[in-house]
């Protein structure tokens, strides 16, 4: 058992929550000294927010690469060291790495002489000082909504943690002190005040605005305008929420010097973002979409995007992670039930929590919305079986939504009663087991079996 696990068991939970960030802070300082401050002279773009971080970061990194820059990217789904070998899966299950692993990665990145590092930055990483010493040149903010309350406890603490990114960027004398902020978000003013050079974006408001918006199942087209500049945008990323993600990337790209052609071509040339609204097509006569949506707001946005393009029934498969924002479970259940014809609840990283209890908490919201157990509400704990059931139920014109996992490569389960097998990894720090799993592969397997 790790030292952290021992300390966590000895001292009260509330006290541990108070002292833990200081431990991370001290750790970050010591490790920066030990590594020789590898972040020095590195140009870093940080993006934070509840939703949209990964898509905005991936899109921005792609635009910079297409414009001739050497770019490294660290995101929820992948890490690209800027060595020309492309992204590797981020199997740590952490959007922002701990300071030691972060600095290890940065040493590799710096050796590759990159022009930019795009760093997806979470509220937990900020509040735990994991990113202490990161010289943010430009920062971006997507939105703030219901998530991570399991850690921050209150919305105000969550918001203050996000604000730390802007304060850190504003302290960087060598940086541009630019913050690109979603002005359509209710909390935008809070962040605008914290940065010397704010640039706002939005559909309803902002310095950078999207007009002439046309949404389709295959993406969107719109005009992005700021000052006297206009960008004719064609995006392959469907959904109104991806218009916001594109605007965030445009605002940052423009700030660091990309021109009109580079911005337009950069967006148009990105075909998809791994685990975000990805279609699985094996020649079947119904749709299958894999998406990482895992908050009430993300559910709202996703259903708003897919309902207009679905002729048949919507079958939604999802769960909720153990020890993570338990308040959202019935809320997501109700949203999904109101927008789906059939709900199949399943595992999504139970960790050390009882899986059936998690499903029952989601089911409370599903039942509230009118679904009936055994009829249009099913519970199938093993995720592979739930995916197969949904695909077997689908008819011509239907849509199967596989939500919450995206392109993650493991499922975290609790240790008691679980039989370990080859490929399973025991995590001593959390007393859990990771077993290999990929949503797209699971869907392909079920679809191929259906064809036979």
Show the residue positions of the predicted features.
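Acidic, Mg2+-coordinating active-site environments of NTP-dependent enzymes
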Residues: 40-42, 112, 137-288, 311, ...
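Short acidic, glycine/proline-rich loop/turn micro-motifs
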Residues: 83-90, 235, 412-416
């Amino acid at each position: 058992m790790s030292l952290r696990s021992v300390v966590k068991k000895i001292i009260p939970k509330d006290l541990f929550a108070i002292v833990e960030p200081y431990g991370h802070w001290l750790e970050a300082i010591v490790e920066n000294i030990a590594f020789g401050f590898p972040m020095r002279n590195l140009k870093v773009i940080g993006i934070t927010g509840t939703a949209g971080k990964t898509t905005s970061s991936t899109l921005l990194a792609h635009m910079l690469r297409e414009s001739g820059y050497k770019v490294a990217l660290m995101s929820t789904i992948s890490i690209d060291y800027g060595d020309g070998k492309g992204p590797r899966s981020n199997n740590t299950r952490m959007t922002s790495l701990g300071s030691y692993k972060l600095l290890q990665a940065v040493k590799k990145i710096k050796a590759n002489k990159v022009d930019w590092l795009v760093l997806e930055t979470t509220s937990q990483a900020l509040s735990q000082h994991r990113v202490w010493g990161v010289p943010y040149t430009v920062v971006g903010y997507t939105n703030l909504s219901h998530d991570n309350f399991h850690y921050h406890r209150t919305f105000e603490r969550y918001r203050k943690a996000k604000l730390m990114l802007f304060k850190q960027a504003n302290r960087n004398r060598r940086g541009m002190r630019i913050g690109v902020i979603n002005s359509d978000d209710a909390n935008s003013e809070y962040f605008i005040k914290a940065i010397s050079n704010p640039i706002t974006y939005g559909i309803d408001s902002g310095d950078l605005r999207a007009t002439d918006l046309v949404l389709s199942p295959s993406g969107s087209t719109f005009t992005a305008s700021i000052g006297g500049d206009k960008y004719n945008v064609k995006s392959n990323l469907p959904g109104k929420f991806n218009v916001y993600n594109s605007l965030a990337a445009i605002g940052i790209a423009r700030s660091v010097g990309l021109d009109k052609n580079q911005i337009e071509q950069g967006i148009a040339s990105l075909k998809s973002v791994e685990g975000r609204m990805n279609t699985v097509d094996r020649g079947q006569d119904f749709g299958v979409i894999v998406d990482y949506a895992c908050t009430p707001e993300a559910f709202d946005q996703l259903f708003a995007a897919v309902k207009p393009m679905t002729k048949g029934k919507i079958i939604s498969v999802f769960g909720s992670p153990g020890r993570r924002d338990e308040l959202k479970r019935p809320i997501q259940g109700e949203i999904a039930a109101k927008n789906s014809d059939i709900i199949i609840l399943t595992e999504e990283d139970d960790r050390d929590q009882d899986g059936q209890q998690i499903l029952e908490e989601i089911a409370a919201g599903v039942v509230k919305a009118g679904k009936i157990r055994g009829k249009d509400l099913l519970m199938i704990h093993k995720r592979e079986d739930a995916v197969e059931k949904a695909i077997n139920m689908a008819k011509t014109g239907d849509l199967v939504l596989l939500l919450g996992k995206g392109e993650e490569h493991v499922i975290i389960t609790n240790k008691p009663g679980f039989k370990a097998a080859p490929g399973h990894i025991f995590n001593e720090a959390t007393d859990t087991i990771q077993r290999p799993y990929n949503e797209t592969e699971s869907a392909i397997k079920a679809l191929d079996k259906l064809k036979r």
